[in-house]
Amino acid sequence: MQVNDLGFVASILFVLVPTVFLLILYIQTASRQGGKDS
C-alpha cells in the first residue's frame, strides 16, 4: 500500500508540476503579446 501511495503521489507531482510551469509560461507569453491585437 505504501509503495502504491508513494507512486500515486509521485505520478501526480510528475505530471502536475510541469503542467503548472507550462501554464505559467503560456499565460505570461499571452499577456505579453497583448489581447487588444486579436
From Swiss-Prot:
The keyword Cell membrane does not apply. Pfam families: PsbM (PF05151). One of the components of the core complex of photosystem II (PSII). PSII is a light-driven water:plastoquinone oxidoreductase that uses light energy to abstract electrons from H(2)O, generating O(2) and a proton gradient subsequently used for ATP formation. It consists of a core antenna complex that captures photons, and an electron transfer chain that converts photonic excitation into a charge separation. This subunit is found at the monomer-monomer interface. This is Photosystem II reaction center protein M. It is found in: Cellular thylakoid membrane. PSII is composed of 1 copy each of membrane proteins PsbA, PsbB, PsbC, PsbD, PsbE, PsbF, PsbH, PsbI, PsbJ, PsbK, PsbL, PsbM, PsbT, PsbX, PsbY, PsbZ, Psb30/Ycf12, peripheral proteins PsbO, CyanoQ (PsbQ), PsbU, PsbV and a large number of cofactors. It forms dimeric complexes. Belongs to the PsbM family. InterPro entries: PSII_PsbM, PSII_PsbM_sf. The chain crosses the membrane at residues 7-27. It is a single-pass membrane protein. The gene is psbM. HAMAP family: PSII_PsbM. GO terms for biological process: photosynthesis, light reaction. GO terms for cellular component: photosystem II; plasma membrane-derived thylakoid membrane. Keywords: Membrane, Photosynthesis, Photosystem II, Reaction center, Thylakoid, Transmembrane, Transmembrane helix. It comes from the Bacteria. PANTHER family: PHOTOSYSTEM II REACTION CENTER PROTEIN M.
